[in-house]
Amino acid sequence: MLVSRRLPSWLRQNLGEGGGHGETAGLIAELELETVCSSAKCPNRLECWSSGTATFMILGNVCTRPCGFCSVPKGKTEELEDDEPERVAEAARRLGLKHVVITSVTRDDLPDGGADHFRRTVEAVRQATGASIEVLVPDFIGKSGALEQLLKSRPDVFNHNTETVPRLYRQVRGRKSVYEWTLKLLADTKKIMPGTKTKSGLMLGLGETREELLQVFTDLLNHDVDFLTLGQYLQPTL
């Protein structure tokens, strides 16, 4: 049972449409794009959209993984939209983005997990803009050749989130996700394309201990991960 508690002032945000929020939202609607900001009901999206920032979500808006922390819809997926890469590129161009983040739902139903669609999207954005490009990818577990196919597009940053410590993996990420595979995916990226920066992130406050976090930090260092983000889990809202 969820208990409603008063949030501290620094977590509360106005729901106004001022600044660039309306412009960003309008463009996303016009081009019929998905963003993780909306699909995951991120509580920070008003702040991000007001500054012209958005994380584009490709491969549809229905995920094949039932991660407990995420509000993205789960269920029956739809066919890929062939012109989606060009629409993402057009949005990035019109927003004047200097750094573009492309993420996706997990598509276990696709033979390559959506890797080639990622490749096409990165290439379209690069052709349309001078922005640096970061991909935040699912694990592609069991998808032979998927990582190699995606990396043909040479993203500037390859991001795959660890999310939590190994002890909590099944509870937080579901039975299909494997901690060791996450580390392998990040390490294999460096082997295939040494010049690519790798990145991972964790949510704090899910019941992990300090010692468990330090072990994950060590594991990521040992697998040549360049960047680590740490965030506090905020329940999906709005």
Stretches with model-predicted labels:
Residues 51-157, 162-168, 178-195, 200, ...:
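Conserved Radical SAM active-site core
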Residues 28-31, 154, 172, 220:
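Alpha-helix boundary/capping residues
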Residues 1-65:
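Flexible, acidic/Gly-rich N-terminal and inter-domain linker regions that tether
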Residues 170-180, 224-238:
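Radical SAM enzyme [4Fe-4S]-AdoMet core and its adjacent flexible, acidic
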